[in-house]
C-alpha cells in the first residue's frame, strides 16, 4: 500500500481526498499483470478532509473519517485528479462505504 502523502489541497464541504492503494502487480497464481489489465483499487488512505456539510442550522456536520484512515469506496464514486504526480480521488463522504480498522 502506498504511504499517504501530505498534500496542499483543501476539499470543500463533505468531500474527502483519498490516495488509492496500489493496484495488484501479479495474480495469486504469479502472473504479472500489465497496466491495462489492472483493476482500479477501491481502497485508499484519506489525505485531506473538508470542514463538513453545511446544515440548515448554519453549523457544519462532522465527518466520520479523518486524515490517515483507510477506507473502501464505491467503484464509480468521486473524481480522479493528479496532485504532484500522484493519483488521488475526491469523494463525497457518502461515496465511502467503510472504514478499515
Curated annotation (Swiss-Prot):
Keywords: Chaperone, Cytoplasm. SMART domains: Cpn10 (SM00883). PROSITE patterns: CHAPERONINS_CPN10. SUPFAM superfamilies: GroES-like (SSF50129). It comes from Rhodopirellula baltica (strain DSM 10527 / NCIMB 13988 / SH1). Heptamer of 7 subunits arranged in a ring. Interacts with the chaperonin GroEL. The gene is groES1. It is found in: Cytoplasm. One of its GO terms (cellular component) is cytoplasm. CDD domains: cpn10. Together with the chaperonin GroEL, plays an essential role in assisting protein folding. The GroEL-GroES system forms a nano-cage that allows encapsulation of the non-native substrate proteins and provides a physical environment optimized to promote and accelerate protein folding. GroES binds to the apical surface of the GroEL ring, thereby capping the opening of the GroEL channel. One of its GO terms (biological process) is chaperone cofactor-dependent protein refolding. The keyword Transport does not apply. One of its GO terms (molecular function) is unfolded protein binding. Belongs to the GroES chaperonin family. NCBIfam families: PRK00364.1-2, PRK00364.2-2, PRK00364.2-4, PRK00364.2-5. This is Co-chaperonin GroES 1.
Amino acid at each position: 500500500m502506498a504511504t499517504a502523502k501530505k498534500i496542499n489541497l483543501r476539499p470543500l464541504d463533505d468531500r474527502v481526498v483519498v490516495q488509492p492503494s496500489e493496484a495488484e502487480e501479479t495474480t495469486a497464481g504469479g502472473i504479472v499483470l500489465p497496466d491495462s489489465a489492472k483493476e482500479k483499487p477501491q481502497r485508499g488512505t484519506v489525505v485531506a478532509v473538508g470542514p463538513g456539510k453545511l446544515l440548515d442550522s448554519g453549523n457544519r456536520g462532522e465527518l466520520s473519517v479523518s486524515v490517515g484512515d483507510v477506507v473502501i469506496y464505491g467503484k464509480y464514486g468521486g473524481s480522479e485528479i493528479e496532485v504532484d504526480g500522484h493519483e488521488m480521488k475526491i469523494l463525497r463522504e457518502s461515496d465511502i462505504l467503510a472504514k478499515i480498522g
